[in-house]
């Protein structure tokens, strides 16, 4: 796959499409940023788990999707906020509460990629990467 200019949007789209198709997992190229986002989604129960594989010096990720008991995707929506063409930065006080606090925001901060609640607790803002609920 050729690298898109927005690897985060690509990550979200691939997860979205895999869920629509009821796939168990999705494979994609690894990056530190992608893994950081996926780790947060897993922590919050939005993804089952993930693996990072290395083959001929190329790293890939396999992301295992999470479905509820009635086989519905746990993730209802993945929304990219900040984009390469239009970056969105928020101070700690403006970090959004997502979907009545059932969802999460993901930020890139001076202390790494964090979910909104953690960034808010540390009183640091950052680039608002995406919302998930």
UniProtKB/Swiss-Prot annotation:
One of its GO terms (cellular component) is ribonucleoprotein complex. GO terms for biological process: translation. Keywords: Ribonucleoprotein, Ribosomal protein, RNA-binding, rRNA-binding. PROSITE patterns: RIBOSOMAL_S8 (PS00053). GO terms for molecular function: rRNA binding; structural constituent of ribosome. It comes from the Bacteria. InterPro entries: Ribosomal_uS8 (IPR000630), Ribosomal_uS8_CS (IPR047863), Ribosomal_uS8_sf (IPR035987). NCBIfam families: PRK00136.1. One of the primary rRNA binding proteins, it binds directly to 16S rRNA central domain where it helps coordinate assembly of the platform of the 30S subunit. Part of the 30S ribosomal subunit. Contacts proteins S5 and S12. Belongs to the universal ribosomal protein uS8 family. This is Small ribosomal subunit protein uS8. It comes from Chlamydia caviae (strain ATCC VR-813 / DSM 19441 / 03DC25 / GPIC).
């Amino acid at each position: 796959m050729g690298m898109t200019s927005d690897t985060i949007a690509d990550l979200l789209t691939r997860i979205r499409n895999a869920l629509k198709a009821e796939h168990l997992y999705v494979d994609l190229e690894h990056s530190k940023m992608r893994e950081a986002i996926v780790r947060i989604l897993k922590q919050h129960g939005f993804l089952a788990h993930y693996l990072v594989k290395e083959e001929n010096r190329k790293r890939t990720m396999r992301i295992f999707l999470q479905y509820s008991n009635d086989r519905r995707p746990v993730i209802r929506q993945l929304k990219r906020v900040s984009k390469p063409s239009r970056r969105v930065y928020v101070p700690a006080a403006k970090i959004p509460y997502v979907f009545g606090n059932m969802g999460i925001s993901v930020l890139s901060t001076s202390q790494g990629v964090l979910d909104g609640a953690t960034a808010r607790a540390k009183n640091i803002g950052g680039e608002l990467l995406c919302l998930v609920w």
